[in-house]
Amino acid sequence: MAESGQFRFSFCPRDATPLVRTRIDGRDRPTCPVCGFAEFMFVQIGANTVVERDGGVLLVRLNYGPRDGRWALPGGLVENDETFEEAARRETTEETGFKVALDGLLATWMRPGFPILVVIYRAHITAGTLRVAPDEASEAAFFPKDKVPPLEELAWPSTAHGLDAWRAYEPPRP
């Protein structure tokens, strides 16, 4: 059960019996009183990149769904056959045309009750030219630290968190 009290299923996926709330492992979970099916809510994993060039960070302006017109870090969900790092590189290339190398984990973000964990990597461009994926973004641009869009123009809380981590990042001293 999500923290909001909503079940993902209303009926058992095995036998179509209406699900009931049952306390399992200290949480209310949707369960089938006939076959015993119990749903455990799992977290999705997203992988984003903070791509820096000439002191600016790369953001994409989304062009779909409720976040249409808002800015986000390049990234997306991790597929079940790839690592976090592979997903971060793949999503960045798909959304921006840039191939990137990852320079390390910058931050993670998760909010209880919101079923996603986002891992955010520092990255630099190794090849490619800027081009947006028209099915995902209307534009992409580099923003200097003092010109990053304000919070209300950002698509996700994880974007704001990643940008805060980028602003605060200090490279290790040799």
Segments and roles (model prediction):
Residues 2, 52-94:
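Conserved Nudix-box catalytic region and its N-terminal flanking loop in Nudix hydrolases
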Residues 7-11, 29:
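Residues immediately within or flanking Cys/His clusters that coordinate Zn2+
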Residues 12-15, 32-35:
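Short cysteine-rich clusters marking metal-coordination/redox-active sites
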Residues 20-27, 41-45:
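Short Cys/His-rich "knuckle" micro-motifs
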Residues 28-34, 104:
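Short Pro/Gly-enriched beta-strand edge/turn motifs at strand-loop
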Residues 34-58, 77:
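Conserved N-terminal beta-strand and adjoining loop/helix that marks the start
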Residues 51-52, 59, 123, 142:
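Conserved hydrophobic "DFG−1" position in protein kinase catalytic cores
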